Amino acid sequence: MVRFGSAASSDNRRRRCWSWYWGGLLLLWAVAETRADLHYATVYWLEAEKSFQVKDLLDKNGDAYGYYNDTVQSTGWGILEIKAGYGSQLVSNEILMYAAGFLEGYLTASRMSDHVANLYHQMIKNVITEQKVKDFMQKQDEWTRQQIKNNKDDPFWRNAGYIIAQLDGLYMGNLEWAKRQKRTPLTKFEISFLNALGDLLDLIPALSPESRNNGFLSMSEISKMYEWDMGHCSALIKVLPGYENIYFAHSSWFTYAATLRIYKHLDFRIIDPQTKTGRASFSSYPGLLASLDDFYILGSGLIMLQTTNSVFNISLLQQVVPESLFAWERVRIANMMADSGKTWAQTFKKQNSGTYNNQYMILDTKKIKLRRSIEDGTLYIIEQVPNLVEYSDQTTILRKGYWPSYNIPFHKVIYNMSGYREYVQKYGLDFSYEMAPRAKIFRRDQGKVIDIESMKRIMRYNNYKKDPYTKHNPCNTICCRQDLYYMTPVPAGCYDSKVADINMAAKFTAYAINGPPVEKGLPIFSWVHFNETTHQGLPESYNFDFVTMKPVL
């Protein structure tokens, strides 16, 4: 039931306004680069009217309040920060989440439109594919909403309901912005498309006639998407020899058309005994309620990183059905409900869609005592294929110094089911877990990581002209530059890095950089050479530095 909280006394109100005044000054100092970049807004739930209202100001009495700092052109990143459920009235969790989504949609609608323009035709090539995707996603959405309605006492589905409420609010916020600006809003499907971007990497092949074949993708077929199109990434967790510190980092690989970035700090005060946290700081994109990369610092003390595993055995994709939850939805549910790597895995494995088949790394900072011990359960590795989620505690490996991730499954059952064993036999050791180029480079260079700066360097590493392990391929390295490949240059590859340590994580702080690597004399990427690729709202070239990401509200 939605109800208002008790009225504050005039003294309390004065104190609140005074603290808000100083907090507002601090916020302006901390986040504003130019006033034109910065947009504050607050969403209110109007109980009597059963409707939402948004105002262009920061009011901590509102049901959701925050800002978007649009500094993509100057730093490579926009910054979105939203707090919800901390206002003067008590609202239901669903109202709270809807308000948070509404605010995000309202603040970032223009960038959401840019992101759709840049990626829609990269992902959906023709009207036949478009209709198949629309039909599948409509069935999946209807099934999800019915499950939420039918299972109100089930904590899993209750938390799923919070996320769908946020998604609905996102659409309505985009609608409100479009109405005020006299612009065409994004459709519900376009917003669903944005959130399902990762899942579409497997869903689109699953809906193609080729998936009905009981075989494997050939090298010529996979070469069209290999390295970047399947969302490949690099990740590393590094433990110093005396447990003095633990660093974690992630570098995303995808089309450079996806470099419209937003780093998000979200803090939702969800009151539910089965919701462990509503707080997260993560790298993301316009209109996405999840990270996609993935790189999360969670209020539960968990860190989540992810890299994608290809499914070469396309017969597995026959098991993809709409009666399931997409990976982005299950990630959000697990992030909210879990307080350990094991409970994260157990939550995530439910209602497996078999899309966006990844390796997830869950680092539990609560189990780490620097300079003393790393307890069992500190690192869980979770991997998915259609109809199976495998997970295990791999803290023993982490204690030896590092955990690398480079788009090859760790668990033998996932590795074999996905077709990697056959690929090694046909195409060589580049597809093996132990002897892949990035496995060798991480093994050789991880010992050089001694501080945050050296962690940044390894995650931006690309010395393909001289490194013997790359074989002169600009993508056989930690941070790929497919645009430099002499045979078929494509504007794609490694386009960001996020780096932090566990002390920074306690403050929801990280360093992030947007753009392909320029280390070792590599040229700065510019769209001048790839103008045929839609890049609406993106910087013309990328030579940014690392930015410190830290919540200020």
UniProtKB/Swiss-Prot annotation:
Residue ranges crossing the lipid bilayer per the database entry: none
Organism for this UniProt entry: Drysdalia coronoides
InterPro entries: PLipase_B-like (IPR007000), PLipase_B-like_dom1 (IPR043040), PLipase_B-like_dom2 (IPR043041), PLipase_B-like_dom3 (IPR043042)
Tissue expression profile of the protein: Expressed by the venom gland.
Domain of life: Eukaryota
GO MF entries: phospholipase activity; toxin activity
Gene Ontology terms describing biological process: killing of cells of another organism; phospholipid catabolic process
Example of a GO cellular component annotation carried by this entry: extracellular region
Biological role stated in the UniProt entry: May cause hemolysis.
Hydrolase listed as a keyword: yes
Name assigned to this protein: Phospholipase-B 81
E.C. no: 3.1.1.-
Signal peptide coordinates: 1-35
Entry's localization field: Secreted
Annotated family: Belongs to the phospholipase B-like family.
